[in-house]
Design a protein with these regions (language model features):
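Active-site residues of response regulator receiver
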Residues: 52, 82
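Helix N-cap/capping motif at the beta->alpha junctions
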Residues: 30-39, 60
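Short amphipathic alpha-helix used as the core "switch/output" element in two-component signaling
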Residues: 39, 61-74
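Active-site beta3 strand of CheY-like receiver
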Residues: 44-50
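Receiver (REC) domain active-site loop signature in two-component systems and cognate sites
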Residues: 55
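Two-component/phosphorelay signaling modules centered on CheY-like receiver
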Residues: 11-29
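Conserved acidic carboxylate
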Residues: 8
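Alpha4 helix (beta4-alpha4-beta5 surface) of REC/receiver domains from two-component response regulators
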Residues: 62, 85-102, 106-114, 118
Length: 166
């Protein structure tokens, strides 16, 4: 089963989520604040982090920012759960790379479970990772068979010579 790190400072709410997710069979770790969350994320390497936004010490937004810039855990899936329902807060989470942003007052416990399953079933984006296995030419070098579209000094696009001399 997937490993889930549950980060929630409200103990009673954390206990409710923990019990429900445990019933689903997830391998759970918990943290009560942002500092604990970061330490646990690096140690446990969860498949998913459920992250409260408003926490003591480090906010969920700051935790997410640190996660996305820490190579060992940068591609970990993250669901943010918060009482903050403003569009600006949701946009902030999305800009930081959250996989799903849920407003606690707008979802049931079962909605949370459904969203966890959806996020875990979504392939991790690798758009920012380099393509391995294909050597890339140095800047300004035109590979054999390609057309040079770099502008010449006069602004016209370059073209390969008709009869190249070697």
């Amino acid at each position: 089963m997937p490993k889930v790190l549950l980060v929630e400072d409200d103990i009673s709410l954390r206990d409710v989520y923990f019990a429900r997710l445990q019933a689903e069979g997830y391998e759970l770790s918990v943290a009560g604040n942002g500092e604990e969350a970061l330490a646990m994320a690096v140690k446990v390497r969860p498949d998913l982090i459920i992250l409260d936004v408003m926490m003591p010490r480090i906010s969920g937004f700051d935790v997410l920012d640190i996660i996305r810039t820490t190579p060992e855990i940068a591609h970990t899936k993250v669901i943010m759960m918060t009482a903050l329902g403003s569009a600006a807060d949701k946009e902030r989470g999305e800009k930081l790379g959250v996989d799903k942003y849920l407003v606690k007052s707008q979802v049931t416990l079962e909605d949370v479970v459904t969203n966890i399953k959806k996020v875990l079933d979504t392939p991790t984006s690798t758009a920012s990772e380099p393509v391995v296995g294909q050597p890339q030419p140095a800047p300004g070098v035109v590979p054999p068979g390609a057309t040079n579209t770099e502008p010449k000094a006069d602004g016209a696009a370059g073209t390969p010579p008709a009869n190249p001399t070697v």
